[in-house]
UniProtKB/Swiss-Prot annotation:
GO MF, one annotated term: protein kinase binding
Xref: Pfam families: F-box-like (PF12937), PI31_Prot_N (PF11566)
Positions of the UniProt region annotated as Disordered: 88-151, 484-522
Ranges for region Important for interaction with PINK1: 91-128
Residues of the F-box domain: 328-374
Entry-linked InterPro entries: F-box-like_dom_sf, F-box_dom, Fbxo7, PI31_Prot_N
Nucleus is among the record's keywords: yes
Role of this protein: Substrate recognition component of a SCF (SKP1-CUL1-F-box protein) E3 ubiquitin-protein ligase complex which mediates the ubiquitination and subsequent proteasomal degradation of target proteins and plays a role in several biological processes such as cell cycle, cell proliferation, or maintenance of chromosome stability. Recognizes and ubiquitinates BIRC2 and the cell cycle regulator DLGAP5. Plays a role downstream of PINK1 in the clearance of damaged mitochondria via selective autophagy (mitophagy) by targeting PRKN to dysfunctional depolarized mitochondria. Promotes MFN1 ubiquitination.
UniProt source species: Bos taurus
Protein name: F-box only protein 7
Ranges for region Important for interaction with CDK6: 128-168, 380-522
Lineage: Eukaryota, Metazoa, Chordata, Craniata, Vertebrata
Transmembrane parts of this sequence: none
Pathway the protein takes part in: Protein modification; protein ubiquitination
Amino acid sequence: MKLRVRLQKRTWPLDMPEVEPTLGQLRAYLSQALPTWGYSSDARFAITLNNKDALTGDEETLASYGIVSGDLLCLILEDAIAAPNLPSSTVSEHSSVQNNDQPSLATSSSQSNIQDAQLHDSLQGQATQSEVWNDDSVSGPGQHFEAEAVPDVVDVEEGTGYYLAEPMLCSESVEGQVPHSLEILYQSADCLNPCDALIVSIHLLMLESGYIPQGTEAKAVSMPQNWRLGGVYKLQYTHPLCEGGSAALTCVPLGNLIVINATLKINSEVRSVKRLQLLPESFICKEESGENVAMIYKDLQKLSRLFKDQLVYPLLAFTRQALNLPDVFGLVVLPLELKLRIFRLLDVRSVLSLSAVCRDLCITSNDQLLWRCLYLRDFRDGSIRGRDTDWKELYKKRYKQRKEAQRGRHVMFLPSSPHPIPFYPSPLHPRPFPPSSLHPPGIIGGEYDQRLTLPYVGDPINSLIPGPGETPSQFPPLRPRFDPVGPLPGPNPILPGRGGPSDRFPLRPSRGWPTDSRLPFM
């Protein structure tokens, strides 16, 4: 039978050769497997299906509990088991006592060592008991148990999850939570102002980067001796990867800033490497000065990234270069496989920029597999290419074609100027001559009359030379535009060939306006 065993948020497989194993056999197999999972073979545990109710009866088969191959079993360690949540047989089996005055499982932690020795002896020589727990006490022949009230344990994994949620590094800090190492350093440093608190965090960042405080008296749980003298902070370190060289940080407060100067000492020669300015107010809360260290610091993730990227790592790289040592970190020392996986996520400009850094990155950036991946990513090409295809040249060719096509579309759809030059034609506009701003469009005397455009409506002579009466043509006469502010369109007695006034269009001014006697064409 194959089962899955879950213990403290981790799951392992368990194989048993028996077809129908019993609970006792399962317990024996689990005891043998615990050392391989990182636990002691003497660890006491309870077998459950729902992580709460323990299974009892070692002689019962697993099938009687409804357990089949592939099921998930949850183990609860003895230390996290509460007395009210377990059946009587399991509790008595794990906590049987030989003395009359021995306390129950819920006693204080000061007697836990004595209980462990007695519980281990009782597990080997005592069978399963069947006493029943009633309320707060259990009585037996010659034995009196007094059960104390113990709060129910909801989930043994909650305690483990709490400790895992605590940040270990400054880069993992969130609001309200800081690493435990920072709390210890801050409490041992006796900080007097925000600058002191910032230097404490900087010292911890140096320790996280692998630097060791110089001097045998320096400890990781406290600040180095004489780190604060006369308003100037001095910290000295060595690094295991830079034997023969030492680094020193000199921090000087200047107004609201702290200037950090990093120097390198090799063979009594001191070189200035880096300089960084930090604002304590950005990372230290002034109003918080209590014992809660988590409320004093803020934006530790930003501080860690800024300090390490701009000072720590460049200092380490410069030290190894000064000692004529090869690089041990960074993009250059990564395997080729990892470089290609990183390069293929970049755009072409970034890849070309990396190729100009050094010879090694130039060789990596010219890999044909990389350019094939970039070509298939950036261009749609379903054609089959040969094995001898130069993918970089092909990418360059297609890239130039795309740029030329984009440039052609840009010229073709070039928008017209929003403010054309007055009195000059615009060659890109459908109407080269801009309209006059003196009259609105459609008004007599405007653009229509200045540059007259007559459409072809039929007879070019009869349609333009009206005679008496209606024009005897099969095409309608060319009528001029009407004046929207003048009289309504209709028969005009002044124009020849239009007829006289009628009842529908009387010859009278409209709305107080005089009759417009101007000719329609100027």
